[in-house]
Amino acid sequence: MKVDGGVGWDLATVAAQAQELEEMGYSGITSAETSHDPFLPLAFAAQQTSRVDLITGIAVAFARTPMILANIGHDLNAASNGRFVLGLGSQIRAHITKRFSMPWSNPAARMREFILALRAIWANWYQGEALEFTGKFYNHTLMTPFFAPTNTEHGAPRVFLAAVGPLMTEVAGEVADGIIAHAFTTEKYLREVTMP
């Protein structure tokens, strides 16, 4: 069984917290997007650890574009020598439209396309495939060499998706590398709703 532990947002102490969690035998270190950015603590943790996965648990996908998260994911995966896991979640309509001032519609379909766009961007960077992603919600068709990362030895990070309902769970099964269950999810719910 793998067990992850969370770090706080105090950048003066997060590296020591991460090192302690790794020494205690945790499998991964998570950083959540609540009152602070979820990525910066993991950048600090990457410098003080060598074994544990570094996971956003979660980062709000719809507050950003796929290109922004492709860059962040690439940089953290490179900084951690391939240990970064991009944990994404949709959040709810009110937060996306009122707090982040971003569009909201069809969250499961949007998330599916978001992750496929990420993968298309990374395929351009890591496999040299042409960037020709055109969808209903996202379009990424321009990538010149100046904007493509050159430190690509670790490849793309894994993508996990937070899912509660059946539609987002289907998306996770289709396009993500793993699923993040909500903290209130029971064993019965996982068995009867999520797993089928």
Q: How would you describe each model-predicted region?
A:
Residues 1-196:
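Active-site-adjacent structural elements that line small-molecule/cofactor binding pockets in enzymes
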